[in-house]
Amino acid sequence: MNHIELINLIKNNCKTAAQEKYIGRLEKKFSIRSKRTLGTLEDLYSSLLVNKQHQLLIETLPYFLTIKFEGNYNHWYCIEHILEDIYFAILAMGGNEVLENQIFCHYKTVYDFINKDGSSNRYAIDLEWNNSHQAINKFNDEIRSCEEDKDVLYETSVRASLSREVVSIILLCKIKSLEFDDSLLELANEQLEILTNAKYKRYI
């Protein structure tokens, strides 16, 4: 699957005005190395997940499996977020060991690289923080702050990010052979359900 096939697949299955807007941006200019493209893809994939387009998300996995980590985590984390959305969709569809392992192997390749040499320690620290229960608590604090400030755009982003954080924790638990707390999945599903509210329609 190339990027044109990816765009056409999603375009033919758009459900919302926001999705059509994101696809329009990608049709105008698409570069998987561009922060603008990656940001639009992240927004689009959040929308697909909130709208329960799980099968569509899964069908796009082959494209993202072709993208290899090249040592720049500042670029890679956006791809990681998209893979986390797809992983969450797989779980929502009842799970698929083969597909879950494909994403896990991609994730572990990056984890192993980050932790293999001292020069990447700052990324290792970031990864440990971003995949912790403390991070979930931090996100909840941010949501409260967004509600107080009435910042709907940022609130949408924070709520959508919770599902990605939960998948990160699942994958990190697999790497470290730790037990995963299933209540975190319930928390993520609650946030995705909240995002179906009309308040967030402009972005979802």
Show where each model-derived region lies.
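Alpha-helical repeat scaffolds
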Residues: 21-27, 57-64, 96-111, 138-142, ...
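Boundary/linker segments of alpha-helical solenoid repeat arrays
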Residues: 69-77, 111-124, 152, 195-202
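Extended alpha-helical scaffolding segments
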Residues: 154-190, 197
